Amino acid sequence: GWSGSYWTMSKYIRQAYIFMDNVKALPKQNVTESDVETMKNECRFMVAYYYWMMTLAYGAVPYFEDDMTSDSPDLMRGQKSFEWMIDWLDNQFLELSKVLPDSWSTLYGGRATKLAALALRARILLFAASPLVNGNEWYLGFKNSDGEERFSQAYDANKWKKAADACKQLIDEAEKKGKGLY
């Protein structure tokens, strides 16, 4: 079943990295290189989604760009700041929107698509622009292991512009695909 705990999310991220490291084309089973690339992009989508869930719940989180084993010296790393995670998520979902398919047949419903990546990106940027984390002094003094602030206390009006642009991009792309607001 579903569990949104930190440990479950980390496990899901690791499983996606293991899959990406090991998936191969299998011509005899009709699994092509194109299929493999699609599966890897879907894993990247899920990794970014799980990092978003952790960032939403915890703010600053440890970030790993590949599989970590329990004996890795890098396993006990510090947290990346909330702003760093938001920038990374923004870039991931924007890149994924360029390589994921526009849609899937109903047989494959629920899989990652271009519009899903753009929608998550817009939602993430809206949250990052909100007063909860944009200039909120409640987080003053919350530092990571490197002594960096976990959250910026400086209000940045440009975050709203970036969020609005992401929402506009999503709406425009959705309308191109026949999925308008009304």
Q: Each predicted region: which residue ranges?
A:
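Short, hydrophobic secondary-structure boundary micro-motifs
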Residues: Y63-D66, S105
